[in-house]
Amino acid sequence: MKSFLYVIYQVLLLPHIILYKRSKNRALIDQDLERWAEAKKINKSKTGLLLYFLTHATDFRTIFYFRLNNLYKHILNFYCRKENRFTIDITTKIKGGILTGHPYCTILNADSIGENFYVNHLVTIGEINGKRPTIGNNVNIYTGAIIIGGITIGNHCSIGAGAVVTKSIPDNCVVVGNPAKIIKKDGKRIEN
């Protein structure tokens, strides 16, 4: 019975595959698929990966619908639901390779987010007075972090759990605390 339902679900995903193949953002979706496959240690074709993650990961579905950015995503969401507690603002520009770790109650409202971005649950990236953060490449943001305002998070940064970041952070930093403090820069511990 389970395998029968699985086959039915795969048939329902055919419109997703067609839209993926015709998407102007296909290269970004491919980067996302590669990152997810690497993290989950899954080796399949791109179409196989797409079917797998659309079937098993509502957070991936949310990212996929964000990448489609057309009317069809609303129709697809009627029968193949996205994660409704994971919000990506439609004006946020996100490069490829986004990976999520259970993004329950996570809001991404940045000006832009670079490649190979990782985000955990309960994270808020938001605006103050219309100014939104810019996030660099290879940035990891962990549980409960808050990043707000017109600030820049540099490349290769990690924002620790519960950190509240209201000031720009340079490249290659590890940041923790409320208010956020840099504890490592370029791999070297910083004494505050």
Task: Name these PLM-found stretches.
Residues M1-K2, N25, S45-G48, D59, ...:
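Serine/threonine-rich low-complexity intrinsically disordered regions
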Residues R81-V176, A180-I183:
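Structural signal for interior beta-strand "rungs" in well-ordered beta-sheet cores
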Residues M1-E83, N192:
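Terminal amphipathic alpha-helical/low-complexity segments used for targeting or macromolecular assembly
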Residues K185-N192:
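Generic C-terminal helix-cap and adjacent flexible tail
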